[in-house]
């Protein structure tokens, strides 16, 4: 059996894809911080990412010959696609960029891990009812492990967060809470409605199209308030669009698609986003000079890694789900 065949058969394949996604997602935090430090406004980071992602996704869907089917669905379910795109992309990324303007990349990436708990807690409301008509319950074991991962991420933040003013800290926290709730909500609702009809990249194009009214209004306001984006900011947004908007989101959507039949596996996959803290810290160390985390941060980092390992071992011990065994 080749390594590729072994990977395809692995029970923990969704977890690996989730971790790969977290690496590319980490680029977002670092790139946005670099742009903020070089004078670019955070208000343009969000719409530029999705404007630049749109042609890439369209080219992929056109290459597959699926544009007609997607557009037909978009016309039929315009308001549904608009709602999913606005929540999953608009109310996720705009607050995230605001938070990124008030703290270093690794700090924002760490606090962002509250999305893991949000995803688990939202399970009963965002999962499809079972054959008996009952909705899935909150997976208790995965919730405990996810809370442990978030606790580790919080330890990494304590030293740096103490240097922020209460106003900045509160604004950052509220922005991240909105983003952390909107992202799993939009993703799961769209996955529940269209996972059988469209693959992850096709679904991303539909959600991106649905988010355009939000981004057009947002960019119009940004132009009036801060002017046009700089050329350097456009290049930074292009990097984010490719790494995070296409590669990372496609990997993450694929991982959640594979685990969608099991609330426990889905919770474990969403917990892989904690890897963003580690990757953001490494990337920030490589490209941005500044203070680093001390021993408390190291303890938090170890806690995050242990939590991810617990999720991985739990998934490896389960039977392969109908999606995960593809």
Regions flagged by a language model, labelled:
Residues 24-28, 65-112, 155, 241-260:
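Specific transmembrane alpha-helical segments of multi-pass solute transporters/efflux pumps
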Residues 1-48, 98, 145-151, 162-192, ...:
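Glycine-/small-residue-enriched transmembrane alpha-helix faces in small-molecule transporters
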Residues 44-47, 51, 97-143, 263-286:
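Specific alpha-helical transmembrane segments that line the substrate/conduction pathway
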Residues 22, 48, 107-114, 190-211, ...:
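Helix-helix packing/entry segments at the starts of transmembrane helices
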Residues 2-7, 53-74, 150-166, 211-233, ...:
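Membrane-interface helix-cap regions at the ends of transmembrane helices
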Residues 3-4, 50, 266-326:
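C-terminal-most transmembrane helix of multi-pass membrane proteins
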Residues 26, 30, 85-90, 94, ...:
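Hydrophobic/small/kink-forming positions within alpha-helical transmembrane segments
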Residues 57, 124, 137-160, 294-315:
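Hydrophobic transmembrane alpha-helices of multi-pass small-molecule transport proteins
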């Amino acid at each position: 059996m080749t390594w590729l065949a072994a990977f395809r058969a692995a029970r923990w394949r969704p977890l690996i894809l989730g971790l790969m996604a977290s690496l590319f997602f980490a680029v977002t935090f670092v790139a946005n911080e670099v742009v903020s430090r070089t004078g670019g406004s955070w208000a343009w980071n969000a719409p530029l990412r999705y404007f630049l992602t749109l042609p890439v996704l369209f080219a992929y869907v056109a290459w597959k010959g699926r544009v007609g089917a997607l557009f037909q669905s978009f016309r039929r379910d315009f308001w549904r696609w608009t709602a999913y795109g606005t929540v999953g992309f608009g109310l996720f990324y705009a607050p995230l960029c605001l938070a990124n303007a008030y703290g270093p990349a690794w700090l924002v990436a760490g606090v962002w891990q509250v999305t893991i708990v949000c995803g688990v807690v939202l399970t009963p409301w965002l999962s499809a009812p079972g054959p008996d008509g009952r909705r899935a319950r909150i997976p208790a074991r995965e919730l405990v492990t996810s809370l442990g991962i978030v606790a580790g991420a919080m330890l990494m933040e304590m030293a740096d967060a103490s240097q922020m003013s209460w106003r900045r800290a509160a604004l950052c926290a509220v922005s991240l809470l909105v983003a952390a709730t909107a992202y799993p909500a939009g993703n799961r609702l769209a996955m529940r409605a269209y996972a059988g009809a469209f693959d992850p990249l096709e679904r991303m194009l539909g959600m991106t199209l649905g988010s355009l009214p939000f981004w057009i209004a947002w960019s119009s306001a940004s132009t009036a308030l801060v002017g046009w984006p700089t050329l350097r900011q456009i290049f930074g947004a292009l990097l984010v669009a490719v790494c995070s908007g296409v590669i990372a989101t496609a990997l993450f959507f694929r991982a959640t698609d594979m685990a969608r039949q099991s609330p426990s596996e889905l919770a474990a996959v969403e917990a892989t986003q904690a890897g963003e803290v580690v990757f953001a810290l490494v990337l920030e160390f490589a490209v941005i000079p500044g203070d680093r985390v001390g021993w408390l941060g190291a303890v938090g980092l170890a806690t995050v890694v242990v939590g991810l390992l617990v999720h991985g071992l739990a998934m490896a011990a389960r039977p392969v789900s109908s999606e995960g065994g593809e």
